[in-house]
Design a protein with these regions (language model features):
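Glycine/charge-rich catalytic "coupling/switch" loops of P-loop NTPases
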Residues: 189, 217-271
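A position-specific signal in ABC ATPase nucleotide-binding domains
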Residues: 19-20, 27, 67
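Conserved coupling/switch loops of ABC nucleotide-binding domains, chiefly the family-specific signature
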Residues: 22-25, 75, 175, 207
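Conserved ABC transporter NBD signature motif
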Residues: 24-32
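ABC ATPase nucleotide-binding domains
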Residues: 38-44, 48, 52-195
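ABC ATPase nucleotide-binding domain helices that frame the ATP-binding cleft
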Residues: 9-12, 108
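Helix-to-loop junction immediately C-terminal to a conserved catalytic motif
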Residues: 16
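Walker A (P-loop) phosphate-binding loop of ABC-type ATPase nucleotide-binding domains
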Residues: 3-6
Length: 280
């Protein structure tokens, strides 16, 4: 996960073998693969534009990677039928890609990447061209396929909601470096730096100085002069400069009970969003 130009797709292309690393080594199941050509790495790939062969039927598209690997005809028939069933497209084998909807084409692309039992599947923003409802539906579908067959999926996206929905672990990229690698909840609750805090979810940030610290609380004096009690993530000592992060959903407007961090403010704008209201 990361903004445009952060190095996500370059990283994926190195894993696939389409880019050559300038330093280091890539290991797959403990074996170095940097000098192995892409077609011999045994890695499945799903692109944003699907890359289906338009002159082949759905069955032939799925059979192609198996024929290249010299699989027998009987095994090809079984594997293709199993892969189509996995993506809920049984009975679509004789259709041409042009006869399918965008969501169906995407499922064929996923099935083709899985049909030869790869050890890893790489997905490069595969849902970017779909509308919102179909994209959300496909997120759950890919997640369920992953859970049912247990294959490792490396999935590139700039959509943080998509990353939080689908992932066991998320690597946040910026400027070619991994800023944080952790579970979705840890990424959201305990960002390691201000970039991750501001990139994941929405955030209000305040600069200040730590004036007191204990094991699970610290007091920060903001540049405005207000004092805030906060969770000390990566805070080491009194006197250091820090940034306080406040998620919008954690703010309570006009609380009925007395509580910490109670401050006066002025509402400038109220925006209705259907299932929630934004207050600025």
């Amino acid at each position: 996960l990361g903004p445009s130009g952060s190095g996500k797709t370059t990283c994926l292309m190195m894993l696939a073998g389409f880019e050559t690393p300038t330093n280091g080594e890539i290991y797959l199941d403990g074996n170095p693969i940097s000098n192995i050509p892409p077609h011999k790495r045994g890695i499945g790939m799903v692109f944003q534009n699907y890359a289906l062969f338009p002159h082949m039927t759905v069955f032939e598209n799925l059979a192609f990677p198996l024929r290249v690997r010299k699989i027998s005809k009987d095994d090809i028939d079984k594997k293709v039928e199993k892969a189509l069933s996995m993506v809920s497209l049984s009975g679509f084998g004789n259709r041409m890609p042009g006869q399918l909807s965008g969501g169906q084409q995407q499922r064929v692309a996923v099935a083709r990447a899985l049909v030869f039992d790869p050890s890893v599947v790489l997905m490069d923003e595969p849902l970017g061209a779909l509308d919102k409802n179909l994209r959300e539906s496909m997120q759950y579908e890919i997640k369920h396929i992953h859970e049912s067959i247990g294959v490792t999926v490396v999935y590139v996206t700039h959509d943080q909601g998509e990353a939080l929905t689908m992932s066991n672990r998320i690597a946040v990229f910026n400027d070619g470096k991994v800023q944080q690698l952790s579970s979705p909840d840890k990424l959201y609750e305990e960002p390691v730096n201000s970039f991750v805090a501001e990139f994941i979810g929405e955030n209000n940030t305040f600069s200040g100085e730590v004036i007191d610290i204990s094991e699970n609380k610290c007091k920060v004096k903001l540049n405005s002069g207000n004092e805030i009690l906060a969770n000390p993530i990566r805070v080491k000592s009194k006197g250091e400069k820090t940034i306080v992060s406040l998620r919008p959903e954690r703010a309570i407007i006009d609380p009925k009970n007395d509580m910490d961090n109670k401050h006066k403010g002025k509402i400038e704008e109220v925006i209705y969003h259907g299932d929630h209201t934004r207050v600025r």
